């Protein structure tokens, strides 16, 4: 990929605008998996990537993970400068995947069998949600509920 305006990169544009992202992601049925570990975890639990955006240096690992989960998602490879112009930030954590959202489970389904639950309410800025989920995983949380 050499042109940030390429239509295949649309899912990855303007990711630094919180208000736009909060509206666009749910409306378009996507979410971003930001790192190879997160992409792999999403694949592991059944999410399917619409595409993967990566730099050349991460391509072998991306290919291996996609092959493991029999994914035929398009892999978009670009130089660091094109990645930064497309996403609005320097991609230093590895590849990103635009993942297709599934229908949300009911609260009862999420809580079934859960002993320790994290509730995130009234979130205004999504930027710290990843840290909350990583902390929840480290603390053995069984379920996470996020209010609108």
Locations of the language-model features?
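Boundary-proximal intrinsically disordered activation/regulatory segments immediately upstream
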Residues: 1-67
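Short coil/turn connectors at secondary-structure junctions
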Residues: 27, 48, 71-73, 93, ...
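RNA substrate-binding interface of SAM-dependent RNA methyltransferases
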Residues: 37, 44, 76, 102-104, ...
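Short, glycine- and charge-enriched coil/turn segments that flank and shape catalytic ligand pockets
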Residues: 58-73, 107-115
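A short acidic, glycine/proline-enriched capping/turn motif at secondary-structure boundaries
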Residues: 58-60, 81-85, 92, 102-105
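A glycine-rich helix N-cap at a beta->alpha junction
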Residues: 67-88
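Glycine-rich phosphate-binding loops that contact phosphosugars or nucleotide phosphates
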Residues: 97
């Amino acid at each position: 990929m050499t042109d940030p305006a390429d239509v295949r990169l649309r899912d990855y544009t303007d990711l630094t605008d919180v208000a736009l992202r909060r509206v666009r992601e749910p409306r378009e049925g996507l979410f971003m998996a930001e790192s190879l570990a997160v992409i792999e975890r999403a694949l592991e639990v059944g999410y399917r990537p619409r595409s993967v955006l990566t730099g050349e240096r991460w391509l072998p690992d991306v290919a291996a993970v996609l092959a493991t989960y029999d994914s035929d998602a398009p892999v978009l490879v670009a130089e660091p400068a094109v990645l930064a112009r497309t996403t609005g930030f320097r991609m230093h954590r590895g590849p990103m995947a635009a993942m297709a959202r599934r229908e949300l489970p009911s609260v009862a389904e999420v809580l079934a069998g859960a002993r320790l639950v994290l509730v995130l309410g009234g979130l205004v800025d999504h930027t710290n949600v990843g840290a909350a989920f990583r902390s929840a995983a480290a603390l053995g949380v069984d379920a996470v509920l996020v209010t609108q």
